[in-house]
């Protein structure tokens, strides 16, 4: 790679949304005013060009349209990074065509994981964090939850694929990432239990099962039937823990929330 190409790549603006907001260009972190940061984040989450009236209304809900439009103009003026923003012939705003975002990279990874057979453990660092978890604006909450569901499903599928491929240690590590994000999500916990059982760690699987049951008891006051029961209930004396070692847990006639 030539020095000119390296400089060109490093000067591409990159917007980070996963975990925390950051803007990098030319190898440096670029500070932005608060409203400019919110504008850039909004455009990074919504990749299509945005009409300015709707954009201002979303960014400043409850503010009169004229005042919101002024705030938007000020936010645009505060983005002093060449190529970061672009307007089309209808005046709609978007990030510039050369701008990179970690969210877009994460979505590419999610699509790749869903489209390919899993035999090796890929780098899933992009799937570790939510979109701007400390931000409370209503416009970000919907996109955050949508991405959260997508990344959890991707981690679960990856763990299940690694278990099927006999890569049990990798499967356990991936499933633990999902469980740490959503401890009460049954599919994440099931992927972890399956990986532990496949690797011969019956005690670890029982620990995860019992922790999940305790979490349900503390949150909803009961432990509804789940797929985990079918993984761990002894069918005969050949069950891995041996006869009589599984402690049955009382069931209640309730359904899972949501």
PLM-predicted stretches and their roles:
Residues 17-37:
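A structural micro-motif at secondary-structure boundaries
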Residues 1-12:
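Basic, amphipathic DNA-recognition helix from helix-turn-helix-like DNA-binding domains
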Residues 13-16, 84-89:
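Short beta-strand
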Residues 42, 58-62, 78, 82:
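Amphipathic alpha-helical regulatory segments at dimerization interfaces
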Residues 73-84, 213:
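C-terminal flanking helix
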Residues 23, 55, 79, 205, ...:
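Conserved RecA-like P-loop NTPase ATPase core
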Residues 2, 28-33, 45, 60-71, ...:
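Intrinsically disordered, charged and Pro/Gly-enriched terminal/linker segments
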Residues 42-55:
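Short capping segments at the starts of secondary-structure elements
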